[in-house]
Amino acid sequence: MQRPFVIILLGAPGAGKGTQAVRLAAARGLPHVSTGDLFRENLKLETPLGKQAKGYMESGWLVPDELVLDMLFARVARPDCVRGYVLDGFPRTLPQAQAFGERLGRIEPIVIDFVVRDATIVERAAGRLTCKACGNIQHARFAPPRVAGKCDRCSAELVQRPDDAPAVVTERLRVYHEQTQPLVGYYQTAGVLRELDGEQSPEAVFRSLMGLLPPQEAA
Ligand code: AP5
């Protein structure tokens, strides 16, 4: 059996990880595992985990590692992840990366670092629109809805994420530089990091991303 194909999308909040993860997962037939989406699902369902994560997310802070790791490990243990998966928003701290590395053992992940300037991040967060029903990501300027306020994919309502408020975005960026950016050096040292220019159009980013990945092996 082939080794699982584990792709980690690293980058600042709003760098375009979610947008590209959906496309990449579809292109490679792999599940898209987003810790942010998993937490938002838990928030919506008002689970104990969602209640614990709520305050951290609303403030732009990271949820404590132990909560993230339990949730993530349970998700990637599901049968749909056996051939691999696309990780979006995980790992985000050195302890998360180390714990995940131990779990992967001899499997080497491919880590893609989305390089995007802070000014671009602020602009993208300010205009982001997310579908309440299917989670599709659009943007008021860069991916405008065909019908105002409605999702292009399923026509449900598009909303702004509460953590895209300007003050929270500033805090998320600060937290990113302090706690997540050190992972770039960590994975560089491990020899598994590939840099991606995330300032290009979504289509050009996708082409560059596919160019950084090895060709898909036959099943
Ligand atoms: P999470 O949901 O992971 O948020 P994030 O990493 O902050 O990333 P975003 O979803 O904001 O951005 P993205 O890079 O996916 O960009 P997108 O494609 O949407 O996490 C939320 C919270 O959960 C965290 O703050 C934390 O509290 C908690 N959490 C999650 N994981 C955790 C972990 N591992 N540890 C601890 N806590 C955790 O794009 C943004 C916008 O730009 C969109 O509108 C899009 O249309 C547009 N856009 C995208 N690409 C382009 C482009 N190339 N050109 C123009 N516009 C573009």
Where are these regions (language model features)?
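Glycine-rich phosphate-binding loop of ATP-dependent small-molecule kinases
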Residues: M1-A219
